[in-house]
Amino acid sequence: MFGAGTIGIAAAIGLKHFGCNEVMICDHSDFRLEKAKALGFATCNNSREDLKESAMAVFGAAPSRFGSTANASIYIDAAGAEPILELYQSMGKIESRMVVVAVRAGKRPVDVLEMTYSQHALIGSGGYNPEDVEDVIAVMVQKKWDIESIITDEFSQEQISQAIERAADVDHALNVVIRY
């Protein structure tokens, strides 16, 4: 999972809920990674740790076109940083897939030849179906994860400017709620 924000952590919880044994979340914010770790996820600060080595320690090894890599089948981009797609293409195992959740303005380059040789799949994700909402409710009712722990701040509607500023501070905030 690329991105330890609200969407990344929620997607990681979904992966665990639907049966993934191991889920690793990577981000550049130690604050957010600590929140993810407290929820039981393996973490990697890929701004200073070797992501491939960390992932191999969690998932084991698998073949790729470029040698041994992490035995991870699913990658999710919940961060939207420009190099993520290229990073996936360089380290994704054969027949792995990348789901893009984070929206980034403009076009993103894809090496279609590499995608073909590695048998990678690139999947877009947008919107919800009624059954998705039912799944989210089931996860919340289950109370297996302390989902409320990702709420770091609450503001009144009159404090919306401060709330937006706080939400942009990834080293001190994760999920900022505005009460109205």
What is the predicted role of each segment?
Residues 28-29, 104, 128:
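Residues in the short beta-alpha loop(s) of Rossmann-like NAD(P)-binding domains
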Residues 18, 70, 74, 145, ...:
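Structured loop/turn residues at beta-strand edges in well-structured enzyme cores
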Residues 24, 97-99, 123, 177:
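Structural detector of well-ordered beta-strand residues that form the stable sheet scaffold
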Residues 86-90, 130-180:
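C-terminal hydrophobic helical "lid"/dimerization subdomain
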Residues 34, 39-121:
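Glycine-rich cofactor phosphate-binding loops and adjacent beta1-alpha1 units
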Residues 1-49:
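Mid-domain Rossmann-like dinucleotide-binding core that forms the NAD(H)/NADP(H) cofactor-binding site
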